[in-house]
């Protein structure tokens, strides 16, 4: 890296002059979109240069290499309707996405979905975490920007036909949130039954972080880690796919596609970033709103995350 910097240094004066000329010009540079638009970061002018690209295009094809997307674009292929399926090297899941959009069809692999649901062990737990990532570490054993748990929501179903219970935790912002989080989570999760999460890497990673810092809880937390199951798998594998999912298996796309009556739009806190920033402002002492009301809003948001998982599983159970 050092040698690369030394090699680039003599070019800086010319680059500065070139950039100044661009800034001072009255005309927008005539440069087509390309991989450079997001290399190394998304350009602030994407909203201008990408105006001719529709909201849903070849750039939304799931897991398609960026260069291949631009190969299609450079051939004049922009929408999914433009793709010649006989001349493409898309993989089966990508083809499924394109065909679903073009034909307006839903794909359901009943056998795979039933294998997944029949393998679930009751009682079932539906779990979701919220985290903060302080730039300056505030607690022992933490790193700059490390994601630290401060809240969870947990829906519990003892049997396939039993009433759903709900439990939750939201830390006191004046204290290290992790010990209280750990102790209540261990109590609420019991010792048996599958724990469903959506995108297993996140919750598993946070639990492993806790095990590293608090080894005295390693046995109980490791038991929870071993019981995790990923509700995202049926959608990631395209066992259940609708055009509304637009190639994504994010819960933000899956939920409105499967359970349109459930929505975050009416909540004061609508997404995880807002929840994180809100709690972090409480931790930093800069929060100026109604603390009790906002804590209730945080609980309401996180509760919907796990209730959404309950409703998604219901859909899978009825295919």
Named regions from a protein language model:
Residues 1-58, 66, 75, 246, ...:
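Acidic, Mg2+-coordinating catalytic module of metal-dependent nucleases/exonucleases
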